[in-house]
Amino acid sequence: MANHTTSIRVALLLAHASVCALLLLSVTASGQTRTTTAPAGSRCNAAAAEPITFVPMPGHPFNPAVSSDGCWVFVSVTTGNPKSVDGVALLSRAAGQLKLKQVFMVEGEPTGSVLTHDDKLLIVADGDYVVFMDTARMISGRGDPMLGYLSDGDSSGSVYVNVTADDRFLFVSDENAQTITVINLQKARAEGFKPSAIVGKIPVGYAPIALTFSPDGRWLYTTSQIAPESYHWPVECKPEGADPATAKPRYPKGAIIVVDVARAETDPANSIVARVPAGCSPVRLAIAPDGARVYVTARNSNALLAFDTTKMQGEPSAALVGTVPVGTSPVGVAVVNGGRQIIVTNSNRFASNQTARQTLTVIDAAQVAAGQAAILGQIKAGSFPRQIGQSPDGRTLFVSNYNSSELEVIDLTRLPIERAGQH
């Protein structure tokens, strides 16, 4: 897999990007001609004309990653069609508008992604591989941006990635392998992204996804959708998508797993310090700015769960401090507005109608112990809202509406909440 870019593919991608850019202009009602070089950060983070903008994407968007200056959004996209493009869409952001600049082909099925803190690398989970791309080349259009594909195991199902604050280590959720792979990113960069940079694997259980660091970088929180048999937890959860009236419980709850980051960097197999029951099929996780609470979407419980992080290691049975019923099959979660609110995507991903538009639920973080009373209202979304990204200034939210092939852009300073009974 040494060379994944050909002149034919580049031509196809450029043509494809041009078509999508025209679509974008029609939706955002922009008549301006903008350059493709990054404007000043203040222009990049300017407010849009409307509180919500739906930007069409060239495929199903999975994850938006935003540059530290807010000028660029990198979105992993898949099509499910072997004749179409799977890759990373690059969008420039200026004067409150997004413009699709180019789509870069990636072999496989790109899903979770992250930018290193120096903004130099875009790292993408890609099934059996982790993909490394040069962001400067992507933005300038000069040179091949593909730096390497690193295999972390056959059929591993790499789905999510995150890096430590110092960019020294990379963590990869292997959904099929039931592990978290730890990679020495410094070594990978120096040696051409070879498997020799893999430090080892953390055994976590069925379908791990979330990779969220505590603010001080000491702990990594991940999720296992179904706890391993070795935990000896009771069977409480019904199969997802089954008729809740007739289905019987078949699985134990899933878990939040707490990892000692320093230990994981040298001895991954022995780095787990806590396992906490977290509802049925916990998937994504966000943490409060002060690190005092973590919030997890329990997809098969149709709920957001809140946990006290100080109790997760010492008193895991007492760590749950709130359960908020949200919409159907919640997936994405973000803590916004300085930790005062939580936003959850209600994916409804197992519904028979996969094109129906869904909602986001907005929650008062101070009231999570009150359950449903903590809900402030809803925000309109596309079909299968999946993943949430934020601009570095905390003023803009990016939601990947997977089935409707849209990137939803929300102005958090003008949060367009629809309250119960509001029309």
Each model region followed by its residue ranges:
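Predominantly soluble domains enriched in secretory-pathway, periplasmic, or organellar proteins
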Residues: 16, 27-423
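Sec-dependent N-terminal signal peptides
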Residues: 9-21
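N-terminal secretory signal peptides that target proteins for export/translocation
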Residues: 1-10
